[in-house]
Amino acid sequence: MASIHIETTGNGPDLVMLHGWAMHSGVWDGVVESLSQRFRLHQVDLPGHGASRDCALDSLDQMTEVIADRLPGRYSVCGWSLGGQVAIRLALQAPERVQQLVLVASTPCFVRRADWPWGMEDSTLTLFMENLARDYTQTLNRFLTLQVSGSEDQARVLAWLRKSILRGQPPTPATLQAGLKILQTSDLRAELNQVSQPVLLIHGRNDVITPAGAADWMQQHLPRARLVLFPHCGHAPFLSFPEQFVSCFDAL
């Protein structure tokens, strides 16, 4: 198996940065300069993404295990969306290594269920999987549009996301379909109360991919959680409000 790509910059306590589905570690570029003045950042390309493109993406547990082998002995972790689920898994699998979590626009369960109203329709994710094989570019564009929905600066953030994807070699359709399958099937709700570390939840109030109700639920069920809600913000608060996003790390 090819190795995971990690870019390390800055000085200070170790902070691991995990991006979301279909993206790569460069998505954090707008906040790296500020954060690297306070932390030693480890920007990870998830399996099948970015410079880790040749590393197979199989499951949430596989992602966690492959990444954990490359991380410092002790670290905090910031995960966006799918990266947030990887962060939760890291904290559960090796609590002695993970000091704190920052979960950005994340959720324990991406799909709406009878007892979980704060998710996407299962049929929507299935349609994304089917359409990736038919029209890769258009399907990615549709997902990026969902990410910026609800933001007051949708055009700017959408342009930035599109530019960010083009900066690296995009994931294969098979990788993206495998990632969507993880989003469709993973449900960490029953395990969430076992996360003993302090958790900072950063969420956009208008997020349509991981609705803010999911963040409220996590705050209630995580033993040591604090929630920061960004108004007029969708699924990418670190792109819509980079300065405010960085200021949230003052509490770490």
Curated annotation (Swiss-Prot):
Enzyme Commission (EC) number: 3.1.1.85
**Entry binding sites for substrate:** W21, S81, L82, F143, L144, T145, L146, Q147, H235
Q: Where found?
A: Cytoplasm
Which residues catalyse the reaction? S81 (nucleophile), D207, H235
**In its UniProt record, which GO terms are filed under biological process?**
biotin biosynthetic process
What general EC class does the enzyme of this chain belong to?
hydrolase
Instruction: Tell me a GO cellular component.
Output: membrane
Could you tell me what reaction this enzyme catalyses? Answer: 6-carboxyhexanoyl-[ACP] methyl ester + H2O = 6-carboxyhexanoyl-[ACP] + methanol + H(+)
Sorted keywords for this record are:
Biotin biosynthesis, Cytoplasm, Hydrolase, Serine esterase
Q: Which Gene3D superfamilies match?
A: alpha/beta hydrolase (3.40.50.1820)
What does the record give as its pathway? Cofactor biosynthesis; biotin biosynthesis
Which Gene Ontology molecular function entries are recorded, alphabetically?
A: pimelyl-[acyl-carrier protein] methyl ester esterase activity
Q: What is its main location?
A: cytoplasm
**What are the AB hydrolase-1 domain coordinates in residue numbering?**
15-239
What does the function comment of this entry state?
Answer: The physiological role of BioH is to remove the methyl group introduced by BioC when the pimeloyl moiety is complete. It allows to synthesize pimeloyl-ACP via the fatty acid synthetic pathway through the hydrolysis of the ester bonds of pimeloyl-ACP esters.
Family the entry assigns: Belongs to the AB hydrolase superfamily. Carboxylesterase BioH family.
Task: Indicate the quaternary assembly.
Answer: Monomer.
- NCBIfam families in UniProt: bioH
Its protein name is Pimeloyl-[acyl-carrier protein] methyl ester esterase
Give the organism's phylogenetic lineage. Answer: Bacteria, Pseudomonadati, Pseudomonadota, Betaproteobacteria, Nitrosomonadales
